[in-house]
Amino acid sequence: MASSTTASLGFHYETKYVVLSYLGLLSQEKQQGPSPPGVQLDVAPQSLNPEVLLKLKSEIEEELKTLDKEVSEAFTSTGFDCHTSPVFSPANPESSIEDCLAHLGERVSQDLKEPLQKALQTILSQPVTYEAYRECTVETAVHASGWNKLLVPLVLLQHLLLELTRRGQEPLRMLLQFGVMYLEEHAAEFIIQQGGWGSVFSLEPEEEEYPGIIAEDSNDIYILPSDNSGQVSPPESPTVTTSWQSESLPVSLSASQSWHTESLPVSLGPESWQQIAMDPEEVKSLDSSGAGEKSENNSSNSDIVHVEKEEVPEEAFPGAAAPLLTQVPTVEAPEMMRAEKTSPTPSVFVELGEEELEAVTARPEAVERAEGAAQLSEERAGSRKKSHTGEAAAVRGAKSGLPAEGKAVLLFGGAAAVAILAVAVGVALALRRK
């Protein structure tokens, strides 16, 4: 960045103010304890004795006052006013140029730690001269670019001031002259092209220059372009992840309704829930058919089914033929009586308890209500004559093939079965309401 441009007096004053202000940051460091003897190779400045720091701060303040007086005296000839300079009088009183440069200096100290240590050791190993300082600064600055390149001489000056002051010397004025000369010779052209020292205030913060750091910290936020937005699928519903709840449910119940069956007692599972909502006639058919599959050797179930079919009046099916009479098994009355005594009708409601079943079979009025329910079922069956033509033929055959005494026994057994089923449905509805 060597420049042959003759720096103006205004630039000279601003450069001198920048160097003094940056060196003054050292006097603002908090005490961190005694420093070990010898040259400190750590980039971070080590604190000095509080008395030494106070003395250094006083020297820098005196130099700033001298600079202000010099600028005021040269105003008539130069026209440079401290009040119009962004370096001396920032637009924002809360900010200062040394604070802006301090952020850049910290980064340079970390990025160029080894080159700065080597340059500091080289300068202190011989008499401190401007030539030695310039050569070491140029060698170190090749590792940086932009404004970071300008921070190299300032950071190196700060460390030299620290080490020489610790050795009992007073190098402030000498180092101030080194810094101003180097910046005017090697950095004036770059600074003027950037708009002067005032452009330091408009530099982007460190976080914006390293967007990768922000991206790593905010990996839970995704900003997708418009062309790829259609490829993103919405998150799965919680009911999908809990498919184990719906595997045991019938098809008519969705996974979101699993709470209905979870709150029911043990005797009312998904199957009984579905049967409660069905027609009583269909419930009887499902009850008898399901029981037949579970116990093939139990003949009482098929007997009850035949009783229900037998009670369908002949007038409901006048045009039905009777070729299926031989397929209807004939059950004797004694056999039916033994079946009723030894083998109760199987049903999905066996969990209701034996006491309730005994109470139902022991009361005659329950039988009468059951006969009324049987007559009601016969009327409903009559309205479905179109879908039960084949069944009517079998019923007619069974009716003509059975004796009168067997019919009475079968009628009583069917009524008892209907009564049991009605009580079971009522108990199930009561449990459901609870």
From Swiss-Prot:
Pfam families: Bcl-2
Chain span(s) of sequence motif BH2: 190-203
Region (Disordered): 224-245, 282-303, 363-398
Main subcellular localisation: mitochondrion
Keyword hit for Nucleus: no
Gene Ontology cellular component annotations, sorted alphabetically: membrane; mitochondrial membrane; mitochondrion
Basic and acidic residues biased stretches: 365-382
Alphabetized PROSITE patterns for the sequence: BCL2_FAMILY
TM stretches of this protein: 409-429
UniProt-recorded name of the protein: Bcl-2-like protein 13
